Amino acid sequence: MELGKAKLLRTGLNTLHQAIHPVHGIAWTDGKQVCLTSLFSVEGEPKFGDTNVIGQFEHVLGLFWGPLCCSGSPALLAVQHKKHVTVWQLQLSALEQNKLLCTQTCEMSEPFPLLSQGCVWHPKMDVLAILTKRDASVLFSVRVDNRRVKADIKGSGLIHCACWTKDGTRLVVAIGSALHSYTWNDIQKSLVPCSFCPIFDVGGYICAIESTDEAQVAVATELPLDKICGLNAGMAFDLPNESEGLCRPSAALTVDTDYYLDRRRSCDSERSGHASSGPIDLTNLLAKHRKSDPSPLIHLRKRDNLTGTGQDSSHLILVTYERKVTTTRKVSIPGILVPDIIAFDPNGHTVAVASNTCNMILVYCITDSSMPNVQQIQLQKNERPKGVCFFTNKMLLFMIGRQKSNDPAFLPSSNTDKYILRLTAKELVFDEESTTKSESPSQHHGIRRHSENFTKEDRLSIKDLILPGGSVIVSPSSRRKLIEEVRSSDLSPVASSADFSDRASSASSVTLENYDMDHITRMASLAVAGQASRDSSRPCSPRYETSEKLYSDATPPKNSKEKNLEQLTQNMERIFTRFAEVQQCLSEIREFTQNGKKIACSYPSAYEPQYVHITCQKQLSENVYTDERRPLLLCGGRICLRVVQELFGLTVVEMMHGPMWITLVADADGFVPLTFKHKDELTIRSARRKSPARPPSGADDFPPESPKSPSMEK
């Protein structure tokens, strides 16, 4: 479902976290307006309904639904602005049908800007945690006032994110690489540090956190570039002493030399076919450059086991708070440098990990196995996940933002960016489906595999994550990689394949891939029947073995052929249908030219009615607006004005046309003297309004006279 243009935060955002209400639907924003989109399930699949705009502010950075703790009580919606939060109470009117009543119950201002996920609701009570970079506070009476209690933050680090445990007794705040735990006492309304472990360091800078169990949280840590670049930096760049021989064994900033040389020979032999996507280390290149020079200015030496510390990858870590704090799981996140999105499904015990700056989503499942597996969901090259959540245990719901092409030579100057948003769902492949696909790799296009050797210490010290299907991927090896550069590689000789992939429809832009651990296979097929290879716009999967080679198969798999032929057949059928419509129009024109009048039009079939969507903007109060959307049947491409007036209770009707509003009139037959096409979107309002109306939903620019909440003046 297309949502339109929006201006959202660039990083650290999960727009679908606490954003779905069972009655009111999905709450989302375009940066200024508060929108509700109805959501319902049909045979386990999500279906999206109408979208209504219920409010407008100067800035909206996030929307969060409160918990369903009291049956019959109005829903609570927290609206996050730049430096303050407003809490609204929403309920359907008992007097008027389809009328939503919105009342502000609480407002809280902060001296510092709020975090990207600056509001976190308690799972069982009307208690809201508000987060800035310096402070964490809890509002415990949001339906009445803004009374709150602050957490006693120890240390000088910056807060990045926080979450409540599922039992609601603990607020866990992520500061740098440490988890600060606070116990919440609802009777005393107090927030005190944990008695047995107030601070727990996970060993990496925390990007996202989510509760997974009654006393367990999952955290995602980013790739520690500062530690990698700073670790042994002095040793790596020190000039050798006279007492030191150049042959003295020392550490290096690179991966295994044999591994790099094999990769280099492989790249040299296959350079004409494609570019290498393996790890290339600058220090190794410099050390082997200019062999004729016996004394380079900087002596670069090899480190033997830098990666043995496990600091060469971003990680997903499960932390349990019981009588002591323990790390129960730890697994690497391949290909995602800054994993700032986590979504957890408590039914299937499945975790989805993504990043606002990477076009793929990884899905893990929590089990006690030493051979975990991950499913990868790949987006288009210019798409980014802005929100991820589970609709069911096998269905993921995404809010995807498509970016405009930015010049990579210039760093972004703002923490926000413009996107074109859409909602989509993707079913995960479990059990038999996953097993069947992993048995025959040659019959599936785009399946990627990678493996790595595991030391005994790694197997004993790290428990990993696995999909329910049983196919798995292990944690990072201690000796095979340092930093893996994820890049695009154009394997197909078809020059326009990347462009064609970018122009693919949004329905087919999300692809699902499986990783398993037998051996490494990478396939790329040529474009068949108008469908180009998607590998040209995808990041390459990591490489860890010295014997791995990249190759392309010019013959597409059978399943891919059948799928492409079926898609081509559907496209041809649509073209033939358009030709039939053109022929009918030409026949009518010819008849009109010969007889001087148009032939009597035949009504369309009841199975294919011709209609338009009419959205009526109504003002509920001074600052609250609502949209009522109805489909209306067309009569030969025309609309009866009297029906529109009675349907929406209007006397004089205005219709939006570009930047202006046009008052509608009727001809002698009572129809608006305009013709409309099937499924046109029309926006109307009453011409007799007392105050300036807000702009229509989805408008790019908001005029200065647009009404704003009084709280926005602060």
Curated annotation (Swiss-Prot):
Q: Which domain of life is it from?
A: Eukaryota
Question: Where does the record place a coiled coil?
Answer: 567-595
Residue spans of the WD repeats: 55-98, 154-194
Q: Which UniProt keywords apply?
A: Coiled coil, Repeat, WD repeat
Q: Name one GO molecular function term.
A: kinase binding
Q: Where is this region: Disordered?
A: 432-454, 531-564, 685-714
Which InterPro entries does the record associate with it? Answer: WDCP
PANTHER family hit by this protein = WD REPEAT AND COILED-COIL-CONTAINING PROTEIN (PTHR14897:SF5)
Q: What is this protein called?
A: WD repeat and coiled-coil-containing protein
Organism (species): Danio rerio
Tell me the lineage of the source organism: Eukaryota, Metazoa, Chordata, Craniata, Vertebrata
